[in-house]
Amino acid sequence: MLKNKFNASEVEPRLYKAWEESGAFKPRKPRPTDTPKDNYSIIIPPPNVTGSLHMGHAVNNTIQDILIRYNRMLGKAVLWQPGTDHAGIATQMVVERKLSKEQKQRKSMTRDEFLGHVWKWKSESGGNINQQLRRLGSSCDWSREKFTLGDPENSDDNMSEAVTKAFVDMYNKGLIYRDKRLVNWDPHFQTAISDLEVENIEKDGSFWHFKYPLAGGETYTYIEKDDEGNILLSEVRDYISIATTRPETMLGDGAVAVHPDDKRYASIIGKKVKLPISNRLIPIISDEYPDPNFGSGAVKITGAHDFNDYEVAKRHNIPLYSLMDECGVMVDSEFMPKKYVGMDRFKARKEVVKDIEEEGCLLLIEDKKVMQPFGDRSGVIIEPMLTDQWFVAADKLSENAINKVNDGSIKFVPDNWKKTYDHWMNDIQPWCISRQLWWGHQIPVWYGYAKDIIKDETSNTKKNDDKKQLIEFVAKSESEAISMAEAYYGCRVKIDNNKGKAENKIVKIWRDQDVLDTWFSSGLWSFSTMGWPNKTEELGRFYPTSTLVTAFDIIFFWVARMIMLGLHFMDDVPFNDIYIHALVLDEQGKKMSKSIGNTLDPLDLIEGVEIQELIAKRTRGLKNPDSAPKIAKATRKQYPKGFEAYGADALRFTLASMAGQGRNIRLSVDRIAGYRNFGTKLWSAATFGQLNRCNSSSSYAPKDVNHVLNKWILSEVSKTIDTVTNFIESYRFNDSADEIYKFSWDTFCSWYLELVKPILSDSHNAYNKETRETFGWVFDQILKLLHPFMPFITEELWHNLSESRPKMLIVSEWPALPYDITDESSVSDVKWLQMLVTNLRSVRADMNIPPSKMAPLLVLSTSLDERLNLFAGQLKPLARVSGISLSEVVPRGALQTVVEGVTYAIPLDGLLDKTVERDRLNKEISKIEVEISKIDNKLSNHAFVSNAPEKVVVLQKDRKLSYLDELEKLNLALINLN
């Protein structure tokens, strides 16, 4: 027997363990009849090893698990490949902080010593997120779990080999190269970072307007005009005006650019200006980049410290002046005024402004909000820096990747993301893949000095250090690098990371100390996880993968790169469909963020959390600690008791039901509670079925049923199966969830269960056995349809409702019928019954008639509809009908309703005290009229309508419409009563 209620906290972990131990998460064995369509695979977007489950993970993995469980039930061989990302900068930061608390510093250790600490941390604390994914119900094949950095203790692990082979192969084909280019530089971590790791935040700032004097004291007539050509200003100037938010960078200016169509500056294009402070002469150039309508229309070009300026500088061969070292400190260089050497960039900013003002070249300081780039982990302002890095020639890989999306080989869902993909790919830049970290795949490149330099050094012939040339030995291993070097030098070679040259006729080479961008190894994820570069059975069965489920913000950083690398190495797309899921927002529609304290931990919703712990979580690690009291107050107001334990099923179903294509999810805790109640409703229905011996039978044949109610429910479940299947296949998860919900709650529980009670309660009824078996069979279909969305409660019910199940629900067959069981006549008859019952209930409710009171039903017709006799047993309990009879006239004051053109009446005599009811109705009418008057006063107040937010005004208008509708019903009830 079923227990009184479903205990998610006890059942969910138990069932997950049973699934995993049974091998249900592993792909089934190949069959001789298998075709590619019989295999289905998804690669999990590998979460950071440092991470913990957040709502983005929850919706992403819920959708993946729905697809995985659905395809598994279709009988396919299913692989859901799990794993984690080594998360270079994030992991290194976590371990450095941990060591700092132990009074240890990375820089005081050797590389190997530090990496030993990181691997130890990973074995003890890393990968907690995988346990959290298990708690969500994710049915990954954990026996195949991968780590982007590989497993150094497992000789069979191929992940490191895959990355090294990919790098060497691409280098040999000219797709990877070393270059000096502009990158996002984090002065705190002293490494290049990706655009995704840069957080642009609006801050209070300034625009400093400077004068750059024309060289040689030249002048020109500066004229400003309005849109109609009228002259607003005309004056002779001996300078050009520029504005900047970063005054310190003017020390590295290489030019001033103006638009070719800007007539104000046409006469001075090609001339030079004298750079204040340093007094260097730089040219005025013509370029499309400046906007004549923004500021003065003239732009300083600092090619070594601004991405847009860098492109302008390249077009015009403008010199690049690097101002800072890796710490953001001004460098000692021939173009740098000695005063600034060794200054921090922000101190230099103040000094530059001060010195320019003293030179008389400061025009204006304008206070403005300024977008500033911050490192998302370091929290410091990012500096565009010109550094030596390794790059992928992405433009050589992009054309094929664009074509595969355009020809339909890869499909985006929703398809509007294809435009975003095309935009990025058609404007693709070299991909910086090197990072100045220790944690990661060390770049497989060794360096040595050119042969002529080695020869000169050993013969004591001195050469200028600036002319030294490095030879690159790109190899899959250290021994291979040594062999390559020995072939080049013609003598013995050894590794010496101190970058020596030669000693006792042994040449020294050293390895590149940088590591690869995490996105490089994760870009190989779709095939490296299946054993590449080895030719494995998994690659043959599961590559290309079927569907990628991911967020929009990594379409370029991960998705596009996987497509490019998959096509390059596998000569095939990495996946067929890309489903871009929605963003999870809070109830007010705001993006969830730790900084504003509105995040919700999925595990708190699954397992419950007390208010104090919830507040502690939301106020821990804030970028602005001063906001903690405000966040605590808001949290206490919104969730005064914290959260109940809603269970994984309720959270999953909520996320699925709100995951409409192209729509963000406004997560409501009330809605999660509502879907927990949905599970309770199913549990109650199952209990009712069990008490009435409603078990499905192996001999049950839906096509052989005879009773109209059973034919109807079979017709409805058949339609639901088709609809849900089509919705899942179309990635319409919200529609499929809603369809299951409506059928389960409304059609089955609210109608069928109630309609068949008279049959089930009568053991002598001819249709008792058929109805019990139909009930059980249909409920089984509900469990199957619902299983991908709510796997735990459905599996528990599946086992408890029958002890003879041959298989667990997780590996049972998806509902499908070999024949049509739709009976339109039965559907029509029951639809009529539902309309009649609904209408009768409605008119009774309008008059406040207690459900306990039975009433006769009068039919204004010459003959009784045969359906009244057919459903007499259902009408009496559901519509509280004491008897049915024909009538030629409607009794005075009787309640009336019309169904399919026939009038049905309920006499009021004896059902209620008319005087009491009349008083109640008049009071209700008066209350509503007062509310309508209040709303009218607000809406007629010009100040309210003008100043209130639009949604507040709309809400008042909607309230009025609702009150007017209610008022109409009350007046009608009063008329009927009188």
For the regions a language model picked out, list residue spans one by one.
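Conserved short loop/turn motifs at secondary-structure junctions
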Residues: 3-4, 83-84, 114-119, 143-160, ...
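N-terminal, positively charged nucleic-acid-binding surface of large information/translation enzymes
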Residues: 1-261, 302-315, 319-334, 345, ...
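Structured ligand/cofactor/substrate-binding pocket environments in proteins
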Residues: 56-68, 75-76, 84-85, 162, ...
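Short acidic, glycine-rich loop/turn motifs
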Residues: 212-222, 231-235, 260, 274-279, ...
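Short Cys/His-rich metal-coordination motifs, predominantly Zn2+-binding knuckles/fingers
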Residues: 189, 278, 378, 449-451, ...
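Glycine- and acidic
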Residues: 1-2, 45-53, 111-115, 140-152, ...
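Active-site-adjacent bridging/hinge elements
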Residues: 36-44, 66, 101-105, 130-138, ...
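Feature 926 captures the class I aminoacyl-tRNA synthetase adenylation module centered on the KMSKS loop
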Residues: 209, 427-520, 524, 568-648, ...
